[in-house]
């Protein structure tokens, strides 16, 4: 079974889940391919989340992990410093400069925070 974006994010957030149930939940969701659907599933797992669009100049203000829309796809950002970023895209982890990431990123993110119920 291929890992999906939400299982990658849940691992980074240390959220308990089963791969089978999460996969079934995603497959049955009408908005499984966009941030709205991801937000609904995160809420089901008691992960607080909020979709925002920010200026690329403010990327360093974000706390990883989070979901971002980049390269016409959805990615999970694992680590972020002023100069480097590490993110999961197209089934692999990529490390690049923040500047290079900002060239493919449109400024849209889904910020996440776990709770005691997550």
Give the location of each predicted region.
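Contiguous, structured surface segment used for ligand recognition
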Residues: 2, 32-61
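Noncatalytic regulatory segments and standalone regulatory/sensor domains
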Residues: 2-13, 18, 26-33, 59-75, ...
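Acidic/histidine-rich, surface-exposed loop or edge segments in extracytoplasmic proteins
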Residues: 21
